[in-house]
Amino acid sequence: MATQWEVVIGLETHAQLSTVSKIFSGASTQFGAEPNTQACPVDLALPGVLPVLNRGAVERAIRFGLAIGSTIAPRSIFARKNYFYPDLPKGYQISQYEIPVVQGGQITIQVPANEKAGKDAYEKTVNLTRAHLEEDAGKSLHEDFAGMTGIDLNRAGTPLLEIVTEPEMRSAAEAVAYAKALHGLVVWLGICDGNMQEGSFRCDANVSVRPIGQEKFGTRAEIKNLNSFRFLEEAINFEVRRQIELIEDGGEVVQETRLYDPDKRETRSMRSKEDAHDYRYFPDPDLMPLVIGQDWIERVQSGMPELPAAMQQRFADEYGVSAYDAGVLTSSKAMAAYFEAVVAKAGTANAKIAANWLMGDVSSQLNRDGIEIDAIPVSAAQLALVLQRIADGTISNKIAKEIFTTIWDEKADDEGAADRIIDAKGLKQISDTGALEAIIDEVLAANAKSVEEFRAGKEKAFNALIGQAMKATKGKANPQQVNELLKKKLG
């Protein structure tokens, strides 16, 4: 049924900019304060006060525009978006309409494979229409007041960058891949903390369907304020099914705004969707046009961090890691910094093993404890020493994992923790050929049946003998030496 239809998705993402004060006032943007304690006369729309643009918000918008290869408008205009809502004190929102500060640009996404649908992973470039500055509204609180609604204006005036894509995504998977890539980028650039639980990064999804081959877009529904990647995927998938079923049953899709109910996993109608003319946009007479000279852009450019794509290429060139590994290592700025700190201590020759550890044991432990890489209890220097001891043959990879877990659990603060634990527990790898031969002779004598099976052509028996040898040495034998000596003795 659904194969007759093509899905069309465009996303509008609100990224809360990481400024200390609001976009048009000096009030704090700190999250979690008591209601209405961070709202000044400008935020409250008291008579006789005027907005003053926050330079830091503009610079963050420029930084984003440079990162996505967009055009930074030399002159842009703030406009009043007129609508009534209890948590919008002025009766209008200051935004940008005809001339946004960021125009165009693109983001390349990696869409993961979908085994159930028989689809391989692929890369896609999503074009952006624009990104514009605007202020956030306050918040209506319905749960804490019986029969009433409370209004908290702490959030009113918080700076937002609204990032709008072209309607180029064709599945929920693509939309989620884009949202994750955008989230990673704004956090990497330091322009947004990306905290989705606090509403710092939230998406509106515009979803429509059309018969395959039809050029004209179908009627779209906008799903508002999706603040998790899972909710984004679920909401889009439900909305696609709803629209297809509605059309195939002879109905028509209505242009409207919908909300997603995560408990019922369905979208429901919120209000009819307005068009731009319904908001009666006009230039805000209280704000001068925003003029951005080339010198300002160059100053922002000089302070830009190395971007993920450039860093991925450098990791591949300098450290010899694969393109996939480089992508994982640059999934966050903190992960990339930790990797480079480990390599700086362990040496470039150990870069590949460092990458394997970060994507394997380190990531596993982070997931186990539910923490991010910037909160890891094992320092880069401590992990580097563990890797050096593997490389110089002091310990086996198995023992290294045991040492790493010990350092993690005891939250050791000494840089030489690995050597201390090796000495205290007697974990040095047995590499003495004579000692290993004696142990292997005992293993062969005690496992005559496995020896016979191996000589009869059963390869699994050889692995069993290796396991017995490692067990006899409590994992301290050099696995490569054990392998070679066993082969030699078994003929």
UniProtKB/Swiss-Prot annotation:
Q: What is its EC number?
A: 6.3.5.-
Against PROSITE patterns, the record matches this protein to: GATB (PS01234)
InterPro entries attached here?
Answer: Asn/Gln-tRNA_amidoTrfase_suB/E, Asn/Gln-tRNA_Trfase_suB/E_cat, Asn/Gln_amidotransferase, Asn/Gln_tRNA_amidoTrase-B-like, GatB, GatB_C_1, GatB_Yqey_C_2, Gln-tRNA_amidoTrfase_suB_CS
Query: Disulphide bridges in this chain?
Result: none
Q: What would be one Pfam family of this protein?
A: GatB_N
Which molecular-function annotations from GO does this UniProt entry contain?
A: asparaginyl-tRNA synthase (glutamine-hydrolyzing) activity; ATP binding; glutaminyl-tRNA synthase (glutamine-hydrolyzing) activity
The organism's superkingdom is given as: Bacteria
Catalysed reaction(s)?
L-glutamyl-tRNA(Gln) + L-glutamine + ATP + H2O = L-glutaminyl-tRNA(Gln) + L-glutamate + ADP + phosphate + H(+); L-aspartyl-tRNA(Asn) + L-glutamine + ATP + H2O = L-asparaginyl-tRNA(Asn) + L-glutamate + ADP + phosphate + 2 H(+)
> What are the protein's UniProt keywords?
ATP-binding, Ligase, Nucleotide-binding, Protein biosynthesis
Which biological process terms from the Gene Ontology are attached to this UniProt entry? glutaminyl-tRNAGln biosynthesis via transamidation; translation
Functional description taken from the UniProt entry:
Allows the formation of correctly charged Asn-tRNA(Asn) or Gln-tRNA(Gln) through the transamidation of misacylated Asp-tRNA(Asn) or Glu-tRNA(Gln) in organisms which lack either or both of asparaginyl-tRNA or glutaminyl-tRNA synthetases. The reaction takes place in the presence of glutamine and ATP through an activated phospho-Asp-tRNA(Asn) or phospho-Glu-tRNA(Gln).
Family note: Belongs to the GatB/GatE family. GatB subfamily.
Q: Which NCBIfam families match?
A: gatB (TIGR00133), PRK05477.1-2 (NF004012), PRK05477.1-4 (NF004014), PRK05477.1-5 (NF004015)
Quaternary structure and interacting proteins, as annotated: Heterotrimer of A, B and C subunits.
Its recorded name reads: Aspartyl/glutamyl-tRNA(Asn/Gln) amidotransferase subunit B
